[in-house]
UniProtKB/Swiss-Prot annotation:
Gene3D superfamilies: Plant lipid-transfer and hydrophobic proteins. This is Protein LIM1. Disulfide bonds join C29-C66, C39-C55, C56-C81, C68-C88. One of its GO terms (cellular component) is extracellular region. Residues 1-26 form the signal peptide. Transmembrane segments: none annotated. InterPro entries: Bifun_inhib/LTP/seed_sf, Bifunc_inhib/LTP/seed_store. Pfam families: Tryp_alpha_amyl. It comes from Lilium longiflorum. It is found in: Secreted.
Length: 90
């Protein structure tokens, strides 16, 4: 379970770094993505608990375009690391 928490934290750090390193990205977007670190416990597989109000508030503060672009950046990471694409079909 500790390794899953570490993985979730690493993913959120990557989110933050991706948002911060993107040219032309506003500071508001970077700060909002950084606030999503409070959602770390809720992105682990098997977590059935409700997110905290702090997490929900941070998510509400993120601009839709900023969130989508950050997700797209994360989706491209395997390709940039010479890894196969991840297919998360439901």
């Amino acid at each position: 379970m500790a390794s899953m928490k570490s993985l979730a934290t690493a993913i959120l750090v990557v989110l933050l770094l991706a948002a911060l390193s993107r040219e032309g990205r506003s500071q508001n977007c970077s700060a909002a993505i950084g606030e999503l670190m409070t959602c770390g416990p809720y992105v682990l597989p098997g977590n059935n608990g409700a997110p905290s109000e702090q997490c929900c508030s941070a998510l509400r503060a993120v601009n839709h375009g900023c969130l989508c672009e950050t997700i797209n950046i994360i989706s491209s990471l395997p390709d940039h690391c010479s890894l196969p694409a991840v297919n998360c079909a439901a």
